[in-house]
A protein has these predicted regions:
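Short alpha-helical catalytic segment bearing the HExxH-like zincin motif
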Residues: 249
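Non-ligating segments of multi-cofactor redox enzymes
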Residues: 1-230, 234, 238, 246, ...
């Protein structure tokens, strides 16, 4: 008796299979980093705190573990885009898990076919908040007023919980903020990353090498498709010269959903228009470093 050969997969079925594989692979990588280095985000931001505390005091920056963590994360981001945000940040992975659980609850209990999320206009405005938050924190650190934040840090509460330690007394505000952030994660993908993450704001400002970013070959796209934007947690439609490209968290959700496979990384031909803004950012950081160094001798 002859065996019937399995029918070859259609292009749509193959894309769906590849998308599932990519999703499970990313989840595995996120779980690995969540278990192995849950405190990387807190360590990196503690480096930001140490940097501006030393600047405010007019002291030479010490090469402690927090500073080295910050330099390592920034250097990695310059070379490989925001891979840390998309795959390795424990807080971001928590947001993905809460968002996935929220979708399951909405589907099973409330029979919603489409998961609720905030309107795009609200998202685009909300993304600006993290830059204001970063500026406010920097101002507090430079002026040596960091004690005003004692007990109010939600990521410090999260760091203690991942280390299986309860927050000490006096962290009521931080616990309340963490609960509110978790609720936000249920109604918007990457809620904290988009709206409140000061490290995300810092990473978005870095002059990432253009060929490390994701790029879309727009001339090969289906007119009116927008599949990449619909899947993007930060409402970003990839363009060759997007001014919002720093908001991309390198989760690669767009790569798996593109029906024409037009989204790529490490393609020099697609990023030739991005070198000028990158060099501009690099120059600004250089001038900032020179100014900070000059201020030490005034």
């Amino acid at each position: 008796m002859e065996k019937t050969q399995a029918k070859p997969l259609t292009a749509a079925q193959q894309r769906q299979r590849d998308k599932k594989r990519r999703t499970w692979l990313r989840a595995g990588v996120q779980l690995f980093f969540f278990v192995s280095m849950p405190g990387a985000f807190v360590a990196g931001f503690s480096g930001v705190k140490q940097l501006f505390l030393h600047i405010g005091a007019g002291e030479v920056l010490s090469a402690d573990s927090f500073t080295l963590s910050l330099l390592g994360l920034c250097g990695f981001t310059l070379l490989f885009d925001r891979f840390f945000c998309g795959y390795a940040c424990a807080f971001g992975s928590l947001g993905d898990a809460v968002w996935a659980l929220s979708g399951l609850v909405q589907k099973k209990l409330f029979h919603r076919k489409k998961q609720f999320r905030l309107p795009e206009r609200a998202v685009l405005w909300g993304q600006k908040v993290k830059y204001l938050l970063l500026a406010g924190l920097v101002a507090l650190y430079v002026t040596r007023q960091e004690k005003l934040l004692t007990g109010a840090s939600p990521w410090e509460v999260f760091s203690r919980l991942t280390a299986l330690r309860l927050p000490p007394e006096g962290f009521g505000v931080g616990i309340a903020l963490l609960v509110l952030i978790l609720l936000g994660m249920a109604v918007q993908p990457r809620f904290f990353c988009q709206f409140l993450c000061p490290m995300g704001a810092a990473f978005a400002l870095l002059p990432v090498l253009p060929f490390a970013r994701l790029h879309r070959q727009s001339e090969g796209c289906i007119p009116g498709c927008n599949a990449c934007k619909q899947q993007c947690p930060v409402c970003l439609k990839l363009e060759e010269s997007s001014l919002r490209s720093g908001e991309c968290i390198a989760c690669e959700a767009c790569v798996g959903t593109c029906p024409k496979q037009n989204i790529h990384r490490w393609d020099m031909a697609l990023c030739k228009h991005l070198w000028l803004p990158v060099l501009g950012k690099a120059l600004l950081f250089f001038l900032l470093g020179c100014w900070l160094g000059f201020c030490r001798f005034i």
